[in-house]
């Protein structure tokens, strides 16, 4: 899978509508900080984003969520997520379903902040509260 396609898929997965330059930069920073390779991300996406992931991938998810304002001090910020999602034109007609899913995931806590971010992301995926999973 080419990086651009992967970037779009991951961006949609993490609630951004497109892979804009700012988000691409955030992805690169989080990859470097958490020693996650493009191959690691491709493997995770190819496996259907299973809930079993290495700690560095969980921390990569935390990094992305924090930089987007969706995770603060280890707490999922459901309202910030909804504020981001309502600006994605492709999903405006699904906001009721998405809002329900986001709210279902808002109190999830993991064993640490990385685990929390990952569990929230898996919950959002399960509840079809993130673009690209409808």
UniProtKB/Swiss-Prot annotation:
InterPro entries: PBP/GOBP (IPR006170), PBP_GOBP_sf (IPR036728). Transmembrane segments: none annotated. GO terms for molecular function: odorant binding. Keywords: Disulfide bond, Olfaction, Secreted, Sensory transduction, Signal, Transport. It is found in: Secreted. GO terms for cellular component: extracellular region; extracellular space. Residues 1-19 form the signal peptide. GO terms for biological process: mating pheromone secretion; negative regulation of male mating behavior; olfactory behavior; response to pheromone; sensory perception of chemical stimulus; sensory perception of smell. Disulfide bonds join 30-63, 59-114, 105-123. Expressed in both gustatory and olfactory systems of larvae and adults. Expressed in antenna, proboscis and larval chemosensory organ. Expressed in five sensilla on each third antennal segment, in the pharyngeal organs and in the dorsal organ, terminal organ and the ventral pits of the third instar larvae. Also expressed in wing and tarsi. Changing residue 54 to T: In strain: 306A, 313A, 358A, 359A, 390A, 773A, 813A and 868A. It comes from the Eukaryota. Belongs to the PBP/GOBP family. PANTHER family: GEO07291P1-RELATED, ODORANT BINDING PROTEIN-RELATED. Present in the aqueous fluid surrounding olfactory sensory dendrites and are thought to aid in the capture and transport of hydrophobic odorants into and through this fluid. May function in both olfactory and gustatory systems. This is General odorant-binding protein 56h.
């Amino acid at each position: 899978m080419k990086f651009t396609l992967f970037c779009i898929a991951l961006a949609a997965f993490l609630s951004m509508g497109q892979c804009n330059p700012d988000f691409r930069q955030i992805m690169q920073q989080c990859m470097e900080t958490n020693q996650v390779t493009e191959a690691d991300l491709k493997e995770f996406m190819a496996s259907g984003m299973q809930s079993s992931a290495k700690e560095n991938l969980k921390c990569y998810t935390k990094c992305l969520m924090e930089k987007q304002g969706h995770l603060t001090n280890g707490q999922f910020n459901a309202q910030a997520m909804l504020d981001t999602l309502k600006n994605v034109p492709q999903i405006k007609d699904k906001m009721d379903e998405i809002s329900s899913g986001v709210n279902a995931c808002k109190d999830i806590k993991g064993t640490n902040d990385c685990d929390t971010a990952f569990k929230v992301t898996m919950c959002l995926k399960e509840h079809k509260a993130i673009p690209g999973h409808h």
